[in-house]
Design a protein with these regions (language model features):
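Catalytic domains of carbohydrate-active enzymes, especially glycoside hydrolases
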Residues: 29-93, 308-317
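Noncatalytic carbohydrate-binding groove/subsite architecture in carbohydrate-active enzymes
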Residues: 30, 124, 154-270
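A solvent-exposed, charged loop/short amphipathic helix patch at secondary-structure junctions
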Residues: 58-75, 141-164, 226-246, 282-293
Length: 358
């Protein structure tokens, strides 16, 4: 909802406006229905709330978002206090994706805030930036150029991985200091492209990286080529889902390999994102939408999560909790808040998998 105010009476201005629905807690920050929707999830990754993909040029504690700010538009996205408080309210472990250019003061203060504010018994996951290996994001070339400037490797593109490892060690050392009284609450994450075991080895072999990392995370997505280079122009859903199933199975096998690489280094293996990755050309937008809403999508997510449990194990974080279907994909496991579970094939499969594991 947008409310435009064109003029006010200076002697009797607008005051105490409250746009929340009647019946909600007057001093509440979160809609309890949204909190309840998140309670099933053990880990909440605050990627989009952190603006890490926006790669702000400067991220300082002085310029950060604070809860009192009407518009949450600081260089670090939504206020960290809101992230911690939502995780506490949902009974989940928060996962913080911190912008690449966060300075030392910011990282130290972040660690202290999370350490002090997070509910007892909860773990905090931290990763520096998001998909620095992915040259589709501006951060990919930023990290590559920093690595090249430091001459970290004779191989051009290895400079990206090694610079990410180098700065992640700096980042995780600061956080380790903040949690030194209870290190078991801290999970220090490196993220990497799914199926890149050699990249894992490169980073773990680089200087003392392995001493400052607890977990390796990848994004086991499937279906990126569907309707673009595979089954172009096809509209028959069973045919499309047969191809998607092949891609799903291949992605799980890559995750199995990545877990083996992480285990070799004594590290946990996690999924930082995952699920279907169908981004159709405009001509196939309608059939892609039908796929997202099809019962066959529920079935493929069932198999995806079942295979993850039996072949991989550990934490799988899907992207994302809520998101509309548009030309950029269909990332949400539901399309809007409050959507009936019966209309959300992906979310229904997720909730069924969670219930089966309780």
């Amino acid at each position: 909802m947008l409310l435009y105010v064109n003029s006010v009476n200076a002697s009797d201005p607008l005051a105490n406006l409250d746009c929340r629905e009647p019946g909600l807690v007057a001093n509440g920050v979160f809609d309890q229905r949204s909190v309840d929707d998140l309670k099933s999830y053990r880990v909440l990754r605050f990627l989009d709330w952190s603006d890490a993909n926006g790669n702000p040029a400067s991220v300082t504690w002085a310029a950060r978002s604070v809860p009192q700010r009407l518009v949450q538009d600081g260089t670090d996205g939504i206020a960290l206090e809101h992230m911690v408080d939502l995780a506490n309210a949902a009974g989940s472990d928060p996962w913080f994706t911190v912008p690449w250019n966060a300075d030392e003061g910011y990282v130290r203060a972040l660690g202290k805030l999370v350490h002090d504010r997070l509910a007892p018994g909860r773990k905090a996951y931290f990763e520096l930036s998001n998909e620095t290996w992915n040259y589709a994001f501006p951060i990919g070339n930023v990290v590559l150029n920093e690595g090249l400037a430091r001459n970290l490797s004779p191989d051009r593109y290895s400079n990206n991985l090694l610079r990410y490892a180098e700065k992640s060690v700096w980042f995780h050392k600061l956080l380790t200091s903040a949690f030194e009284d209870n290190p078991a609450r801290l999970v220090r994450v490196l993220n990497l492209q799914n199926g890149n075991g050699s990249g894992i080895d490169q980073m773990m072999n680089f200087r003392d990286t392995k001493q400052w990392v607890d977990a390796i995370a990848t994004a086991p997505y499937f279906g990126h080529s569907l309707l673009r280079t595979v089954n172009v122009g096809v509209t028959d859903l069973p045919t499309l889902f047969a191809s998607l199933e092949t891609m799903r199975a291949q992605t799980i096998e890559l995750a199995v390999s990545d877990k083996a690489s992480a285990t070799k280094w004594g590290k946990r293996y996690l999924s930082y994102e995952g699920g279907q990755h169908i981004v159709p050309p405009a001509a196939s937008a309608d059939v892609a939408m039908r796929m997202q809403r099809s019962p066959l999508m529920h079935d493929i997510y069932q198999r995806y999560l079942s295979d993850w449990k039996t072949k991989v194990g550990g934490t799988v974080t899907l992207y994302s909790a809520t998101g509309a279907i548009n030309q950029y994909g269909a990332w949400g496991i539901r399309e809007y808040a409050g959507q009936p579970v019966s209309e959300t094939p992906k979310r229904r499969a997720v909730l069924e998998a969670i219930a089966a594991n309780q």
